A protein has these predicted regions:
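C-terminal cap of thioredoxin/glutaredoxin-like
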Residues: 4-6, 10-32, 107-205
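Structural alpha/beta surface segment adjacent to cysteine/selenocysteine redox centers
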Residues: 11, 15-112, 196-205
């Protein structure tokens, strides 16, 4: 029987983007179900940050691109503003309900970090959902009605799990922060006998 592995994510995080592809592959190698939980990452604007924070932000995107280059060089462009990712995160919850979460998530990350998608605009999220063959209007209705409360419930769960950033995996109460901690996570899954016998488990990278 599969165990549940929580993954807290935000579409505006380059490191959550780096974790996405290997996270989708985990269930192929381990007897787990990855439960993707949106988390609203609060980022200060330029006027609220210190010089040190600016340097850290610049380095973070440089480092994310360095990791992306090791995996074929997909685009990770820095954002032109601080984004309210709630419309896209609610879109993720809608996509989970409607059964197209993976293609939705892959497209949101890729388009956002190519600066081709404004994740704070519900109409653009709806257009993407329509392009994926699903109902953009149904998403907009969900975003007006049930979606905000569903996202709030995810944030409350994140607080209970002491989540402070993304990506964070939670396995049996143990947190693993960052895509570069995935090899440690995989070691823990293997220690608990969750590696699939028909698949050679290799560390994510």
């Amino acid at each position: 029987m599969s165990e549940t592995l929580k993954l807290y994510f935000d579409y505006k995080s380059p490191f959550a983007y780096l974790a996405a592809e290997p996270a989708f592959a985990l269930s192929e190698r381990y007897a787990i179900e990855v439960r993707w939980i949106p988390f609203f990452l609060r980022i200060k604007g330029p006027s609220q940050r210190s010089q040190y924070s600016d340097w850290k932000a610049q380095y973070s995107y440089f480092d994310a691109r360095r990791w992306a280059n090791k995996r074929g060089g997909f685009a990770i462009k820095g954002p032109l503003k601080v984004y309210d990712s709630a419309p896209a995160l609610i879109g993720g919850l809608y996509a989970q309900r409607a059964g197209f979460f993976r293609p939705y998530t892959e497209q949101v990350y890729a388009r956002f970090f190519r600066r081709e998608l404004e994740i704070d605009l519900p109409d653009q999220v709806a257009a993407l959902i329509s392009a994926l063959g699903h109902s953009g209007d149904a998403y907009l209705a969900y975003a007006r009605d049930e979606g905000p409360a569903a996202l709030d419930a995810c944030i409350e769960e994140a607080h209970a799990d002491q989540i402070f950033g993304v990506p964070i995996f939670v396995f049996r109460g143990e947190r693993f922060w960052g895509h570069d901690r995935m090899p440690l996570l995989e070691e823990r899954l293997a220690e608990h006998g969750l590696a699939r016998a028909d698949t050679a488990a290799s560390p994510a990278g």
